Design a protein with these regions (language model features):
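Short N-terminal or domain-adjacent regulatory/targeting segments
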Residues: 1-10, 242-245
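Short boundary motifs at domain starts and secondary-structure transition points
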Residues: 12-18
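Catalytic alpha/beta core domains of metabolic enzymes, predominantly
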Residues: 106, 116, 121-256
Length: 256
């Protein structure tokens, strides 16, 4: 039986940090017209959470974001929707100024259509504070995330990042790193396990990316990771498995 987080997070009918790990699919669409169809395709695959990576859509403004969120809700029904506008420095496609990106995130929170929001831990208190306040007011759980597409810190460093995210007000802490050896994958899983043993109380997302790190996406829940990301029509990060393959492998490892 996998170790659960002390703090459980509720998001439109799902429990994050409970007995069952959840699978999230990224929604990537380059144009407004593509978005509803792509969303419908992903919903049919049966994810637990859908992540709209709005940074994949260039030129979208605040008004369009709100309108598209309402349109998405009509397509996805009650499926929990995570809103992410990933900055380029952490593997995203957003080249906007920080103020423009912040405006999109705040508008999404104001819309009432999202149930989770992701912001990078490195964005700093000045950028995070308005999002944190708005998320609290909207009762929308906040994911504070850290991505390193070049290397994997030692387990102590990864654990420190989980702790920093919790201290900064995260409801969920996410760390995704790139391994250069099998030992790096073990460092990620070790840090997750130590966090779950008591160092961190909130739910965790722990990912080792690329082909070396695939095992973390499948077996991560055994070490305390609460959400894993799969590929639908398109992967949003290296190493994501198709959702059907991921669920089958997880069922085998977790004994479901």
């Amino acid at each position: 039986m996998r170790r659960q987080s002390r703090v459980k997070v509720k998001a439109r009918g799902v429990t994050i940090g409970g007995a069952d790990p959840l699978v999230c699919l990224p929604l990537l669409a380059a144009t407004v017209d593509e978005l509803p169809g792509r969303a419908a395709e992903l919903v049919a695959l049966g994810p637990d959470i859908l992540e709209w990576r709005v940074d994949a859509m260039e030129g979208i403004d605040v008004g369009q974001v709100v309108a598209l969120l309402r349109r998405l809700r009509q397509v996805i029904g009650e499926l929990p929707l995570l809103f992410t506008c990933r900055m380029a420095a952490e593997g995203g496609r957003c080249s906007r100024a920080s103020g423009e990106r912040l405006a999109l995130i705040l508008a999404a929170l104001d819309s009432g259509e999202i149930v989770l929001v992701d912001v990078e831990l490195c964005s700093g208190p000045q950028s995070r504070s308005p999002v944190t306040a708005k998320a609290r007011a909207a009762a929308c759980p906040l994911i504070l995330s850290h991505h390193d597409f070049h290397a994997t810190p030692p387990a102590d460093g990864i654990l420190a990042t989980f702790c920093a995210a919790e201290a900064a007000g995260a409801d969920i802490a996410k760390v995704a790193v790139m391994p250069r050896s099998s030992g790096d994958v073990l460092s990620l899983l070790t840090a997750c396990d130590r966090a779950r043993q008591g160092a961190v109380g909130i739910p965790l997302i722990a990912i080792s990316m690329g082909s070396l790190g695939v095992v973390s996406r499948v077996a991560g829940p055994l070490f305390g990771s609460d959400i894993t990301f799969a590929a639908g029509a398109e992967a949003s990060a290296p190493g994501q498995l198709p959702i059907g393959e991921l669920r089958l492998a997880m069922a085998t490892i977790l004994g479901a």
